[in-house]
């Protein structure tokens, strides 16, 4: 009998020792941010692009353990000295007299007031759908300079004068009906009754404004229209025309509806329109990545991913020729500075990722074995001449770089780090990358003393068995390799960027806290995300439900094969917005792998979400692919455990998208949980939803009851 009691007590103690999702774990989870806060010294460097002491000085601040300190740096020799905050006397000024507009609102462009650069006493205003010339600010005596504007086709007053003050370039707008989303604020703060409101919100398939470039000859009071609209007929948007040097031509950009064609167009003062640059792709042109700088009247610097990666090109108007400036196995990100002469000779400073990363790396064999190949997403800075020669790497260290350049672009302050490498801040020459001075080296000893451990970078092939996926693995601080840990993936796979953190970040909001409950939390960039190759990204086309899941599953399986404590039979997933759509999609389309999902504010049917994001990746017109990718249409497939959350005032994704999923799940007789957050906007769930998410995964994947909420009080 005594032996049986001893065995029972031993078993109970063993189970208690292996418990996860305990009150202590919850307190650790809720306290990780505070635990990590303020424990990295001289690492969070903030460079201010202010030059109060002239072009030879830069300023930066950092945290030294007792507070924020500011330094001035001589960009030529690297000498620094502590100073007061150079912005201490600066006061933020708010614009007065203007109206506030929501970012989804399409302005009617009737409130412009364009000053004549050649005659400051003149300006153009909009009145009765036409343009009027105002002299000496006497609006009452304004003279009509157009007569044919009407409600169905009016002149925009958001235009530009020619430098000589004779011409005014603008657009005529044929307005389309507006689409509105209706909101109910159920529990306003200062009243009992709900508040109802509407928000302008165009959705896929909606009609759009039609825009026609036009030039008004103010001197002769005549209008010059394009002789043909063929080159910009089926438009998603036409930008306002801009004057070229000499005031004889204008340029504007045309973005085709469906985004398969993008053109930079030129119009002369006779109404002739010609194509300068054209981008075309049978799937889509990611127009938000296009970038253009008119260097002078002859040359244009242009960024395009036509080669399969984003690169820079120099367009010569005289020769009508587009010549590569950059090329190769990297992806140009941002253009920092460009200088040129009339003949197109000069240089450009830019950032890019992926250069030299032909071999994307292999999985590490253990936690302490580093990956020798550089992360292809790391950002570096380069300088190259506009003839495509003399490429100079300005940031040689294998790390992710964040640079701020001096006023004249002679030098730059660069902070580089990685998930596992603490930040180092240096001053370098912008001409050749030569190290001028090391300014700061982060001290993370306090952080390490707290028990903190960095996430691990893990690399494994995706669906094709050869293209490597890069991600991170976060373990709890009390990690015990003898235990079994469920896996939770944090997902956001929306095309247009990459999302796995690359900088040294002690507290990873989407991973660190949740891991403390007794989970292994992972995040990776799979196919459908950006900055590798266009083919890598375009898996998403008319196929957002893919979300890189074949790659994600392969990567997680590879990690679990490497680390047996990762329990591949208990995999959860969570995300917000597009990540909310993807989290639910994981349960609907891959139920054999994902067993539990938390989906917040998801765009669960792309027909319900904002036009510009969804038509970019799903195409136009709206077709059956929208239905095939819809979580609403596929709700009957649900097998795993699901928690949905939405803010009733979500002004990013129409909350009805979540309500429609709820309705479809009810009709399909599916068991699930739903959290409606009164007054909340676009959110992962705020504090309440975060706590519910913790409990949901503890119950669903750990199979244990979470501690009562009133027990979770700080010690």
Language model segments and positions:
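Predominantly five- to eight-bladed beta-propeller fold
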Residues: 78-92, 98, 145-159, 170-228, ...
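Beta-strand C-termini and the immediately following turn/loop, strongest in propeller blades
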Residues: 59-64, 74, 116-129, 134-135, ...
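Non-catalytic accessory segments flanking enzyme active sites
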Residues: 46-50, 55-57, 61-62, 67-70, ...
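A short helix->beta-strand "capping" segment at the edge of beta-propeller domains
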Residues: 20-44, 98-105, 223-229
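Beta-propeller domains
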Residues: 188-196, 201-324, 333
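Serine-hydrolase catalytic core recognition
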Residues: 247, 395, 400-715
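Short loop/turn segments that connect beta-strands within beta-propeller blades
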Residues: 75-76, 136-139, 217-221, 268-271, ...
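Hydrophobic h-region of N-terminal signal peptides that target proteins for export
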Residues: 8-18
């Amino acid at each position: 009998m005594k032996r049986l009691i001893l065995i029972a007590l031993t078993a109970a103690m063993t189970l208690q020792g292996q418990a996860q999702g305990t009150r202590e774990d919850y307190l650790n989870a809720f306290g990780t941010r505070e635990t990590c806060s303020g424990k990295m010294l001289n690492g969070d460097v903030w460079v201010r692009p202010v030059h109060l002491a002239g072009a030879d000085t830069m300023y930066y601040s950092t945290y030294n353990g007792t507070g924020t300190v500011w330094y001035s740096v001589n960009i030529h020799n690297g000498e620094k000295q502590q100073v007061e905050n150079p912005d201490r006397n600066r006061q933020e000024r708010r614009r007065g007299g203007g109206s506030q507009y929501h970012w989804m609102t399409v302005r009617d462009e009737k409130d412009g007031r364009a000053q004549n650069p050649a005659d400051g006493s003149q300006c153009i205003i909009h009145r009765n759908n036409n343009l009027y010339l105002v002299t000496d600010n006497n609006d009452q005596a304004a003279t009509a300079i157009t007569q044919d504007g009407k409600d169905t086709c009016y002149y925009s007053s958001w235009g530009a004068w020619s430098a000589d003050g004779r011409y005014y370039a603008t657009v005529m707008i044929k307005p389309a009906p507006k689409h509105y989303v209706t909101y109910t604020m159920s529990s306003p703060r200062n009243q009992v009754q709900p508040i109802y409101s509407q928000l302008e919100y165009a959705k896929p398939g909606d009609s759009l404004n039609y825009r026609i470039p036009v030039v008004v000859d103010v001197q002769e009071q005549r209008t010059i229209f394009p002789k043909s609209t063929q080159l910009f007929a089926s438009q998603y948007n036409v930008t306002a025309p801009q004057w070229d040097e000499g005031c004889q031509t204008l340029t504007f950009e045309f973005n085709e509806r469906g985004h398969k064609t993008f053109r930079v167009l030129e119009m002369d003062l006779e109404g002739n329109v010609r194509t300068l640059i054209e981008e075309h792709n049978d799937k889509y042109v990611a127009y938000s990545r296009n970038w253009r700088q008119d260097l002078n009247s002859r040359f244009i610097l242009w960024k395009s991913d036509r080669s399969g990666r984003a690169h820079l090109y120099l367009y010569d108007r005289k020769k009508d020729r587009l010549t590569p400036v950059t090329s190769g196995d990297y992806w140009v990100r941002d253009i920092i500075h460009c200088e040129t002469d009339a003949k197109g000779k000069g240089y450009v400073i830019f950032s890019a990722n992926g250069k030299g990363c032909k071999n994307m790396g292999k999985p590490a064999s253990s936690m302490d074995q580093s990956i020798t190949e550089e992360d292809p997403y790391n950002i570096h800075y380069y300088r190259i001449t506009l003839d495509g020669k003399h490429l100079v790497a300005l940031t040689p260290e294998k790390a992710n770089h964040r640079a701020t350049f001096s006023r004249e672009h002679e030098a730059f302050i660069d902070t580089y780090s990685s998930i596992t490498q603490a930040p180092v801040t240096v001053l370098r020459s912008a001409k050749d990358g030569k190290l001028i001075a090391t300014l700061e080296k982060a001290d993370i000893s306090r952080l390490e003393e707290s028990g903190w451990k960095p996430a691990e970078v893990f690399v494994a092939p995706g669906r094709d068995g050869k293209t490597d996926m890069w991600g991170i693995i976060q373990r709890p601080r009390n990690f015990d390799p003898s235990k079994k840990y469920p896996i939770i993936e944090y997902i956001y796979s929306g095309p247009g960027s990459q999302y796995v953190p690359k900088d040294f970040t002690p507290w990873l909001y989407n991973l660190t806290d949740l891991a403390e409950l007794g989970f292994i939390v992972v995040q990776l960039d799979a196919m459908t995300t950006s900055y590798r190759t266009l083919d890598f990204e375009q898996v998403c086309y008319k196929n957002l439900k893919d979300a890189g899941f074949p790659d994600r599953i392969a990567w997680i399986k590879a990690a679990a094969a490497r680390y047996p404590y990762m329990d591949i039979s208990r995999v959860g997933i969570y995300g917000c917005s597009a990540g909310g759509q993807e989290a639910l999609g994981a349960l609907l389309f891959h139920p054999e792998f994902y067993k539990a999902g938390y989906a917040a504010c998801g765009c669960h049917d792309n027909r319900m979400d904002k036009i510009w994001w969804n038509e970019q990746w799903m195409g136009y017109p709206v077709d059956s692919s929208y239905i095939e990718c819809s979580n609403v249409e596929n709700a009957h497939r649900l097998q795993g455990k699901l928690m949905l959350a939405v803010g009733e005032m979500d002004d990013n994704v129409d909350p009805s998208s979540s309500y429609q999923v709820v309705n479809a799940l009810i009709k399909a007789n599916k068991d699930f949980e739903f959290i409606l957050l009164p007054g909340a906007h676009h959110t992962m769930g705020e504090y309440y939803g975060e706590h519910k998410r913790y409990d949901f995964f503890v119950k669903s994947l750990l199979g244990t009851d979470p501690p009562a909420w009133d027990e979770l009080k700080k010690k």
